[in-house]
Regions:
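Active-site neighborhoods of metal-dependent hydrolases
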Residues: 1-10, 16-46, 51-62, 74-203
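Conserved divalent-metal-coordinating catalytic cores
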Residues: 70
């Protein structure tokens, strides 16, 4: 439980690094992680990697690279700029694959700025790879398990509710106004940006 509430200690980071070194020795192709605010467990509990410090990420990437091989892949949140990933690629001497570089209607230039930063990093001799989608990101969801909006700060009170309690919150005008306001504000990374014309009720 502590892993979803705080950063790892140096001792815990070393234990994780040992597991990664063992995996690389056994033939793993690399190490993957996420800082995406959309990645939560049950009840909105953040995935442990979302709480990891930059130092933890770097230590684990360097553990991966101990044999001179491996690719680090990260689904990055807004707090992990390309410049930081370039630094990690340089210090570990290994490629970094960055996902998911998706267009954001409230901040349309952000994904292109990331792609430009990746190109510039490669021109400086780093190996950064940006993952893009060849088709629109689509999914089915329900209001009981609303993955596209789980990363919204305004939606957090709903994540631990079920049944009548959830229905009451969803009907609360103040809750709805907070969600609308957050969706209207620009964001570096967000799965859903209030593009209601793209949402279809199927059941």
């Amino acid at each position: 439980d502590a892993a979803t509430q705080r950063e790892a200690t140096p001792e815990e980071i070393e234990r994780m690094a040992a597991v990664i070194r063992e995996a690389m020795d056994a033939g793993a192709v690399g190490f993957a992680s996420s800082t995406s605010p959309a990645h939560n467990g049950e009840g909105g509990i953040p995935m442990p990697s979302r709480l990891a410090s930059d130092e933890e990420h770097l230590a684990l990437i360097q553990a991966m690279a101990h044999r001179g091989s491996g690719v680090y892949m990260v689904t990055k949140g807004g707090q992990m700029p390309v410049a930081l990933l370039e630094e990690m690629a340089a210090r570990a001497g290994r490629p970094v694959m960055i996902a998911a570089l998706l267009h954001n209607g409230t901040n349309p230039g952000a994904v292109f700025a990331d792609l430009d930063a990746i190109s510039a990093a490669n021109a400086r001799g780093r190996k950064l790879i940006g993952q893009v989608s060849c088709c629109p990101l689509t999914m089915e969801f329900t209001l009981a398990s609303p993955y596209p909006v789980e990363g919204l700060a305004s939606w957090q009170p709903a994540l631990s509710l079920k049944g009548a309690a959830l229905e009451a919150l969803l009907a609360d005008p103040q809750f709805r106004d907070r969600v609308r306001a957050e969706l209207a504000a620009p964001a570096t990374f967000r799965l859903f940006n209030g593009e209601w014309d793209k949402v279809h009720v199927v059941q």
